[in-house]
């Protein structure tokens, strides 16, 4: 009964008039992502597992990564997926649908597309180091994507930490850590050094706060920098991002 109500819920127009809908699910409705996921499970997941049993894939909502061995296979699978989606009333996104070459030291050929972003991570050729053989090489690795890094920096800036001069450092850290711990938990699973610029950006705001709060630091960036280094040394767990090893 509740599912039926969700599906038949009218659409509120800009002029305040309720319009009756005849298809689809309400945009932003609680049932919409659930129904979409069930639909794609049978419309895509079950189909590709049956038609291409040797091809691995990952799907999150309507974003999919399909792993192929050769370019020829990739083109065949892409064409088949296009036909399948058309048969169930969907289509491939013309800009986001790409064949990407996973370039590394063992796959050195040159292709136009050598990176993609999935679930906030950007996968591309990156420098790596073999500790056993003590040599550098290129691997195809994920790291927090540029878009997500920019989003995190903007979020940090929006907090305007420097205005909270009536708070002490521990009170300042509380709400900040609630958000930053989530970022670190997800985005440091692979290539954690990618998030260090965000950590330094947060440190910059902490130092701005310190210069406004303490008169002895007000006109000295050097002393503020030394102050922050001292706090990190005394209380390395005060801010969640300080658990990463990086220079200020």
Each predicted region: which residue ranges?
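Non-catalytic terminal/accessory segments
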Residues: 1-248
